[in-house]
Structure formats: structure tokens, C-alpha cells
């Protein structure tokens, strides 16, 4: 293979990335990249042939050096960053600046982290005289970073006794039916044990896992790296350079920069797709019966065909028992039953018509989305409106959580940096940011936030707290040759203008205040309080379904809450496992922890946000404390229930519906639970929230259309720099030109059948929704939009970019 052939082959491989089988947006991306590359290669060959006319002997060296440079910065996923760069190369040259003498550097710093996924390929597997074939062509690649299991179905048994399987990602807990597979094979005289079958599955699953990134500025990055590489080559080379040699190096630079320009053109296009605002989809509302004040609408709900499915859901969630009938709904104890409009879509507008300031009357928003896409899309609507943000991100431990939790440190930093920065943009000027980490990530985490806030406090959460401070809990880990880890770290971040409520607590073992696990909120009686009697102390709770502050008479010793929280039970306590164990207990945080965070940094109806929502503890606590809330989560555990290997578990929507019903003693699935906080604040139920999905990067890639026509209809010196995607359709299939009436019609159903136009426009424009009517959305600024005859100019950022 000549060096020229080697270069073009390598360039194609590294630009397009490893071949991925299956379906979805990333498959469409590979097709688009391949078409783009084929045209670029033709133009590049012409330019190289012209450039080396005077120096034919330099041709092989040119290709050798081009290959040597570019192969350092490309990965199996097609991402562009430091990959196999030799350590001695000066890639850390920008450590110091005039303002700072220490800067954290990591090799994926210039990238958007997209997801971690395995690149599956169809493959044969043979061992112990058995032959298998796994067809990966139907695997629909992951949209984001959720964990998803594979499941296998028999496709056929071939004449040579090769057992062929179709492989897919599991949907809603679908599992491989090994027993049925073994029975089918036995009928076909294929002798195989369950152990050998599982071994074959494991062999297939051990395919390469890669991180997918997008370079934020590929052109600047690669040009900078080429300059560093060429300067090093220049100064370490000959002491004297002939004119011809200088000209050859100029040719090398010129060609290298053309390659860089064409690579960055496409990478920049991906950046635009990644950052484009996303459509809100598949939206519904959950509202308790007591909030539906029009009895005629309630009667319509009770007579609606969807009431059967609604009751079935309540039964699955444990809200009502199997004997529950429609006639029972009139009972006073069921006034907080959560009605989901997905079962009553034709009544949804009637229900919404009861509210004259819709967004302000909602208690919260649940958003199913990868969190970068969610934060970026809702930023115009919620910019500087969030009072407190709490996140409990993956700690980089590899534990068995429902999301990927094993990253290279550099990938984790890239994942967190952009999401933290976006989250901060949503905070009010007096808002606070809470970052919850363990010892695997707290050092890196603090580096990401230290320049974002004027004040950063460090709180130690004692995960081994007991009722008796002298006592301790221990298990098998206690006997290891190390100091047992018994804490996690909370970084409490704020600026000079902040809202903070001072909390006090009694001695939990001896107190007679009767406040349960609650803290006391201190309110100064005078301008400069210096002693306890200078304060009034109150607790927040519900009285007769009204939330407010209740005075507490202090007649015993109390203590200010410090920065070591050793009085909050974690899930090492059996009491917590019984009362609050909803789902993935190993990573779930106690409600009392979130209660303290929320009460210290917000007031009633302030917005609380968590965009690593997990099982929904933050939104559950915020709701019970009469705060508005935003929760972002992805994957199957966003739903009411989701399947695990150990059975069904309560999901985020299920938990929030349970909260709306009042956190009453509900059997899920075999024990009765009611969180301590619900008793302490006298929570009885009620609420109104919206949930929806967002279009994902993967969805957008799947729907984007790029033509195979001539990209370079007019060649020029700027052919590599000019924006070449101007003629491409992208997502313009949603538009139809009515030439007769000189109008542009918008049909968003051509993209997705379930777009929520009102929420999409609210996120896009930043305007809050006042009312939604048939064919119209009204915003709080008085403006109205006809949703049946949309002006294409309004939605342009969603479907076309340049």
C-alpha cells in the first residue's frame, strides 16, 4: 500500500468513524459523512496534484506527514481531540495566563460530550462445536447516556446448525426469554445448555465501548495543533533550509489546512445540530381531582373511555386497590387522585381552560431528555428564574445505576462542565447551586465551579449517621484495610447577592419540640441579632391544606446547623430503607437531606431545579414544601414504573403521582411506605404539573436531510471555507410552499407526530404560557400565536440553521 493510499484510507476511516450497524440518527450521520467525504476527496486529490507538480519527489513524504499528523487526533467514534498524541508533544502549553497561574486541563476539554455507547457489529461466534450468528442491523442506537440492556431473539437455525439471533436494545424492560430459546433449539435437535447460551451472549456483548464527542471549534483546535507540530519539526530538523524545502513545507501546511477546513465544516454543522433548540413532544398534564373545579368536566372524565386505563394505572402504582370502582372516586379521601391527561386527550383543553395563567399555576415540569439538550432548550424560558439548583451527578464509580456511571476522568469533566455552566445560567441573581459528589469526583467537581461563584461552602454529609452520635453502623466493608468511607461532599455555591435562611436544630435524642426531623428557621426580631432570644423560630408545614410558617416556642437548647450534617439518616438505616426505598437505593438521597437544602436556600413558590433527577427525590420534596420545580431525567425510569432484573420499580412519574395523591401508605409492591417528611409537614396531597419529552440530538440527526449533489458547484480558493450546506434541506420537510397563494405552510407532523407547539414556542421565545386554546397559544406578554397556521419564521431556528 502506497503512502498516498494509506493516507486517503485512514482519512476516510477516521473522518467517518468505525462502521456502526443498526438504525437511528447516528446511522444517518455516517451516511451523510460518507457522501460528504466522497466529494471532498475528489477536490482534495485535484489540489494535491496541482501543488506537487514542481516537486514530484515530495509527494510520498507529503502523504506520510499528513497521515502522521492527522492520525493523532481522530478516534473510533469520529470525534476530533487528543487521541494518540505522543506525550512529549507540547499539548499543555496554555497552562498559564496573565490572570491565573493554575488552570485545570484535560484532553477532552474542547468537546461536547454526547454519550458513551458500544459500537455493535454483526458477528459469528463459535466455541465448543457450537455456531452462532448475531445480527446487529436492527439495534437502534441509544439517544443519550441511559443504560440499556440487550435482548436476543432467535431469527433462524441455518442448515449448518448455526443459530442466528436478532439483537435489539430492550424497551420497557423486555428481556431475553432464554427458556423459550432453549425449548425451540431442543425441538430442532440443537443441544445447548443455558450456561453456554449465556456465554454466547456475553461474547457478543464484549464489543468496543466508545465516547462520542463533538469538537466545539475543530478548525481552531487542529490549526493550533498543526502549528505546534510543524514548529517542533522545523526547529528539530536541519539547521539550514533550502528554498525548495521551505516551499515543500508551505505545500504541506496549505494542504493540511485544507483538510482541516473540510473536516471542521462538518464538525461545525454537528455543533449547530447539537445546539439547536429542540421540539417539545408527547406532553401531558397531571392534575389532582380537587384542582378540576368544574364538576361537569369531572363528570366527563368519569364517563370517558380512558377512565379504565387511568384506574388500572392507579392500581399498578398502589394508589387504589384491585377492588376500586369508578363510583368510589366521589369519596372525599380520593380528592387527590392524580388525573393524567394522556388518557383524556380530547378533554385536555377543557381542563386547561380552568386556568387563566397556566405556567404560573403549574407546580412543576418533568422533562424527559438528555440534560444538556434540556437545559439548552429551556434556557430562554427559565433564564435567571431558578432559586436553587441541586444536582447529584454520576460519581464515576461504575455502580449499577440506571445511567452510565463509568467514565474516564476527562469524559466526566467534559460531561459536567457544559451542564454545570448551563445550569448556572438559569439561576436567579440571589440563587444558589448545590453540587453533590463523593470522593471519586469532589476534587474535579470543585475545579469546575470555583471560578463561577464568589462563595463556595463545603458541607460534609455523614452517610453513616445514627440516632446516637456515639454509636456507629458497620458492615463487611468495615473490616477492610482502610479507613471506612462514611461521608459525601456537598458544595454550596452562591454569589455576593444571595438568599439564605439560617437553620437551627434541637438535640434529636432528647427534644420535646414535636417537630419531627424538621429544622427550625430563624427570623431576626431586630436588625443585628446576637443571641437566640433575638430570633423567632418557625417551621414550614401544611395546615388545612394551606402552606405556611408556624411559630415554635423554644424552651430547650438548640444548635445552629453547621457544615457537618451528621443528623440526617441515609439508606444505611433500616428505617430509611423501609420508608423511602423507592428504586435504586444505593444512589437515592434521603428526603430530609433535600428538605434542608431547599429550606435553607428558597422560599415558598421559588423554583427548584434538578437535572440529574434520578428517582425524583428533589422534585418530590420541593412539591411537598410548596416550591415550584423542574426535573430532567432520561431513560425508562422516567416513566411510572420500569423493569429491572429484580422486578418492577417505581419511576419518576410514578413517584410524583404518588406525591400528588398525598404520600399515603401505598404498597409498592410488597411493603407499605410513607416518607417521614410527609408526616412532619402534614402533607395531604394535591398538585398540577406538566411532563413532556424533548427532541434529542439523535432524533435531529435522524430527521436531517443532506443531499448528495455537487457541494462545490463553484470552485474557488475558499471552497473549503465557504458554508457548503446552504442548499441542504436539513429539516425543511416541515415546510410546503403554496405558490398559488404565495404562502409557506408549516406541517410539523412531517417531522414528529406529537409536537407540543405551545411549549416549544415558550421555550424558544422565553415567553411564559398564559392560556392554550384550540389553535392558539397566548403568552403572558399578551402576544398570541395561531398554532394551526404557524409563521415559518418563528420556528426557523428549530428546522434550519446556517
Question: What positions do the PLM features span?
Answer:
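Glycine-rich adenosyl-nucleotide cofactor-binding module
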Residues: 355-377, 574-607, 613
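Accessory, often C-terminal, charged low-complexity segments
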Residues: 1-352, 363, 379-383, 387, ...
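Conserved proline-anchored active-site loop of SAM-dependent methyltransferases
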Residues: 381-399, 608-622
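Phosphate/oxyanion-binding active-site loops and adjacent basic polyanion-contact surfaces
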Residues: 214, 218, 367-371, 408-416, ...
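Mobile active-site "lid"/loop adjacent to the S-adenosyl-L-methionine
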Residues: 387-389, 393-415, 419, 430, ...
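Short acidic/His/Gly/Ser-rich catalytic and metal-binding motifs that mark active-site loops
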Residues: 395-402, 469, 572-576
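Short, glycine/acidic-enriched loop or turn micro-motifs at the edges of active sites
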Residues: 373, 395, 441, 613, ...
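Conserved SAM-binding loop
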Residues: 367, 434, 611, 631
Amino acid at each position: 500500500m502506497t503512502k498516498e493510499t494509506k493516507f486517503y484510507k485512514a482519512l476516510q476511516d477516521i473522518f467517518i468513524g468505525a462502521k456502526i450497524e443498526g438504525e437511528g440518527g447516528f446511522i444517518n450521520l455516517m451516511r451523510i459523512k460518507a457522501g460528504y467525504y466522497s466529494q471532498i476527496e475528489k477536490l482534495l486529490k485535484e489540489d494535491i496534484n496541482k501543488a506537487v507538480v514542481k516537486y514530484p519527489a515530495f509527494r510520498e513524504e507529503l502523504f506520510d506527514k499528513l497521515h502522521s499528523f492527522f492520525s493523532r487526533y481522530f478516534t473510533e467514534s469520529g470525534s476530533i481531540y487528543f487521541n494518540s498524541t505522543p506525550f512529549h508533544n507540547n499539548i499543555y502549553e496554555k497552562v498559564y495566563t496573565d490572570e491565573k497561574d493554575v488552570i485545570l486541563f484535560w484532553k477532552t476539554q474542547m468537546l461536547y460530550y454526547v454519550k458513551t455507547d458500544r459500537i455493535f457489529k454483526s458477528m459469528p461466534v463459535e466455541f465448543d462445536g457450537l455456531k452462532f450468528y448475531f445480527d446487529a442491523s436492527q439495534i437502534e442506537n441509544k439517544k443519550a447516556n441511559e443504560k440499556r440492556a440487550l435482548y436476543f431473539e432467535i431469527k433462524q437455525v441455518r442448515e449448518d446448525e448455526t443459530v442466528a439471533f436478532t439483537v435489539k436494545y430492550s424497551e420497557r424492560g423486555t428481556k431475553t426469554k432464554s427458556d423459550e430459546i432453549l425449548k425451540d433449539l431442543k425441538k430442532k435437535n440443537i443441544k445447548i445448555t443455558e450456561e453456554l447460551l449465556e456465554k454466547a451472549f456475553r461474547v457478543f456483548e464484549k464489543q468496543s465501548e466508545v465516547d462520542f464527542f463533538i469538537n466545539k471549534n475543530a478548525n481552531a483546535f487542529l490549526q493550533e495543533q498543526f502549528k505546534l507540530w510543524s514548529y517542533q519539526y522545523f526547529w528539530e530538523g536541519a539547521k539550514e533550509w533550502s528554498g525548495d524545502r521551505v516551499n515543500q513545507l508551505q505545500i504541506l501546511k496549505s494542504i493540511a489546512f485544507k483538510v482541516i477546513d473540510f473536516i471542521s465544516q462538518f464538525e461545525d454543522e454537528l455543533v449547530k445540530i447539537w445546539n439547536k433548540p429542540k421540539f417539545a413532544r408527547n406532553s401531558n398534564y397531571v392534575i389532582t381531582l380537587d384542582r378540576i373545579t368544574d364538576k361537569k368536566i369531572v363528570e366527563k372524565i368519569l364517563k370517558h373511555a380512558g377512565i379504565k386505563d387511568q384506574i388500572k394505572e392507579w392500581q399498578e402504582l398502589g394508589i387504589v386497590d384491585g377492588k376500586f370502582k369508578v363510583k368510589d372516586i366521589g369519596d372525599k379521601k380520593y380528592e387527590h387522585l392524580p388525573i393524567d391527561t394522556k388518557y383524556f386527550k380530547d378533554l385536555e383543553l377543557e381542563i386547561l381552560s380552568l386556568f387563566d395563567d397556566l405556567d404560573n399555576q403549574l407546580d412543576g415540569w418533568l422533562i424527559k431528555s438528555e440534560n444538556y439538550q434540556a437545559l439548552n432548550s429551556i434556557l430562554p424560558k427559565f433564564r435567571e428564574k431558578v432559586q436553587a439548583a441541586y444536582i447529584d451527578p454520576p460519581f464515576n464509580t461504575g455502580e449499577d445505576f440506571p445511567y452510565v456511571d463509568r467514565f474516564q476522568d476527562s469524559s466526566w469533566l467534559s460531561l459536567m462542565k457544559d451542564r454545570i455552566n448551563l445550569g448556572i445560567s438559569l439561576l436567579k441573581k440571589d440563587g444558589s447551586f448545590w453540587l453533590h459528589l463523593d470522593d471519586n469526583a469532589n476534587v474535579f467537581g470543585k475545579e469546575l465551579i470555583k471560578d463561577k461563584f464568589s462563595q463556595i461552602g463545603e458541607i460534609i454529609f455523614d452517610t453513616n449517621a445514627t440516632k446516637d452520635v456515639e454509636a456507629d453502623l458497620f458492615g463487611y466493608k468495615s473490616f477492610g484495610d482502610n479507613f471506612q468511607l462514611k461521608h459525601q461532599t456537598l458544595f454550596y455555591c452562591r454569589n455576593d447577592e444571595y438568599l439564605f435562611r439560617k437553620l437551627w436544630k434541637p438535640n434529636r435524642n432528647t427534644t420535646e419540640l414535636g417537630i419531627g426531623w424538621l429544622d427550625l428557621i430563624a427570623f431576626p426580631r431586630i436588625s443585628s441579632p446576637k443571641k437566640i432570644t433575638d430570633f423567632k423560630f418557625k417551621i414550614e408545614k401544611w395546615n388545612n391544606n394551606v402552606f405556611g410558617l408556624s411559630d415554635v416556642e423554644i424552651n430547650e437548647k438548640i444548635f445552629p446547623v453547621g457544615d457537618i450534617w451528621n443528623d440526617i439518616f441515609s439508606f444505611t438505616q433500616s428505617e430509611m430503607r423501609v420508608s423511602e426505598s423507592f428504586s435504586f437505593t444505593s444512589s437515592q438521597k434521603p428526603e430530609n437531606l433535600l428538605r434542608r437544602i431547599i429550606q435553607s436556600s428558597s422560599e415558598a413558590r421559588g423554583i427548584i431545579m434538578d437535572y440529574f433527577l434520578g428517582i425524583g427525590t428533589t422534585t418530590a420534596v420541593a412539591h411537598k414544601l410548596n416550591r415550584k420545580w423542574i426535573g430532567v431525567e432520561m431513560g425508562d425510569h422516567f416513566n411510572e414504573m420500569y423493569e429491572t432484573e429484580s422486578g418492577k420499580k417505581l419511576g419518576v412519574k410514578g413517584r410524583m403521582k404518588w406525591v400528588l395523591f398525598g404520600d399515603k401508605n401505598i404498597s409498592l409492591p410488597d411493603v407499605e411506605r410513607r416518607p417521614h417528611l410527609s408526616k412532619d409537614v402534614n402533607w395531604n396531597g394535591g398538585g398540577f404539573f406538566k411532563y413532556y419529552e424533548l427532541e434529542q440530538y439523535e432524533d435531529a440527526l435522524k430527521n436531517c436531510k443532506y443531499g448528495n449533489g455537487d457541494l462545490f458547484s463553484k470552485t474557488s480558493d475558499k471552497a473549503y471555507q465557504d458554508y457548503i450546506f446552504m442548499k441542504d434541506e436539513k429539516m425543511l420537510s416541515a415546510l410546503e410552499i403554496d405558490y398559488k397563494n404565495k404562502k409557506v405552510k408549516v406541517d410539523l407532523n412531517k417531522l414528529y407526530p406529537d409536537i407540543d407547539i405551545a411549549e416549544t414556542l415558550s421555550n424558544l421565545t422565553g415567553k411564559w404560557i398564559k392560556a392554550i386554546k384550540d389553535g392558539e397559544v397566548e403568552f403572558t406578554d399578551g402576544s398570541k400565536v395561531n398554532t394551526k397556521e404557524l409563521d415559518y419564521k418563528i420556528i426557523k431556528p428549530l428546522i434550519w440553521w446556517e
